[in-house]
Amino acid sequence: MSNNMRKLFSMIADSKDKKEKLIESLQENELLSTDEKKKIIDQIKTMHDFFKQMHTNKGALDKVLRNYMKDYRAVIKSIGVDKFKKVYRLLESETMELLHAIAENPNFLFSKFDRSILGIFLPFFSKPIMFKMSIREMDSQIELYGTKLPLLKLFVMTDEEMNFYANLKTIEQYNDYVRDLLMKFDLEKYMKEKGV
């Protein structure tokens, strides 16, 4: 199993998804139309621009945090603005890497399964999600992103993956490939090896 897919699965695993649930979700895959792919890319670009604004424009970050947080003052006092800036800088970089991966190989968004990738970015993009978080939950999310995400390099594809996506023709081929990777993947062993 390639390193990049392992990294992706480890992030998905952090969201409490079970291997069986992931395999089951593959049954629901269908080909993406050009319009659907464009919509996803637009979503990623919107996220990227938002994340960039958050760490380059102090006023914009302050306004968003005031608007997105239940208790703005307590969050800033407990966590601090610098941690948010660091995470938003990191997320800008990751969304750019994702856009580069898609540009290099459009089939990277071949399946609806790949939409789960966007979930990685949602906690720091979605007001409803951020608003529901306690200070402790927000701090732990910042810690997760700040320590794990830089190690994973999610969207740097190996030659094997580039070749696979370039030659991908059918959804069945994709399902078989990912199902095989999931069945072979040992999360506990991987996490232990990486010290994650």
UniProtKB/Swiss-Prot annotation:
Gene3D superfamilies: CAG pathogenicity island protein 13, CagS. Coiled coil: none annotated. It comes from the Bacteria. This is CAG pathogenicity island protein 13. The gene is cagS.
